[in-house]
Amino acid sequence: MADALDLAPLLAAGWSHDPERGVLSKTFGFETFVAAFGFMTRVALWAEKWNHHPDWSNSYGTVEVSLTSHDAGGLTERDLKLARKIDELAAA
């Protein structure tokens, strides 16, 4: 599954790949809880639109995101697409 995917750009952007779990993950830092929650809200709108949802947690200004395609048992292009969008939203 992940073998055919080009993970290099995402890894260079700070994402981590756990091949045993089939997961991409990244931690995002924000100055305030409100900024972190706003980021999560923006991501949630895209995730709902694309029907592909992250596993994540939030503690004050930190948001930890993990992506996998549970139905496929690992990473798919949907995860990479959402990861790219998440990076775009974090930079906005």
From Swiss-Prot:
Keywords: Lyase. It comes from the Bacteria. The keyword Lyase applies. Gene3D superfamilies: Transcriptional coactivator/pterin dehydratase. It is an enzyme of class 4 (lyase). CDD domains: PCD_DCoH_subfamily_b. GO terms for biological process: tetrahydrobiopterin biosynthetic process. The keyword Chaperone does not apply. Its EC number is 4.2.1.96. It catalyses: (4aS,6R)-4a-hydroxy-L-erythro-5,6,7,8-tetrahydrobiopterin = (6R)-L-erythro-6,7-dihydrobiopterin + H2O. One of its GO terms (molecular function) is 4-alpha-hydroxytetrahydrobiopterin dehydratase activity. It holds the Pfam family Pterin_4a. SUPFAM superfamilies: PCD-like (SSF55248). Belongs to the pterin-4-alpha-carbinolamine dehydratase family. This is Putative pterin-4-alpha-carbinolamine dehydratase. It comes from Cereibacter sphaeroides (strain ATCC 17023 / DSM 158 / JCM 6121 / CCUG 31486 / LMG 2827 / NBRC 12203 / NCIMB 8253 / ATH 2.4.1.) (Rhodobacter sphaeroides). The lineage of its organism: Bacteria, Pseudomonadati, Pseudomonadota, Alphaproteobacteria, Rhodobacterales.
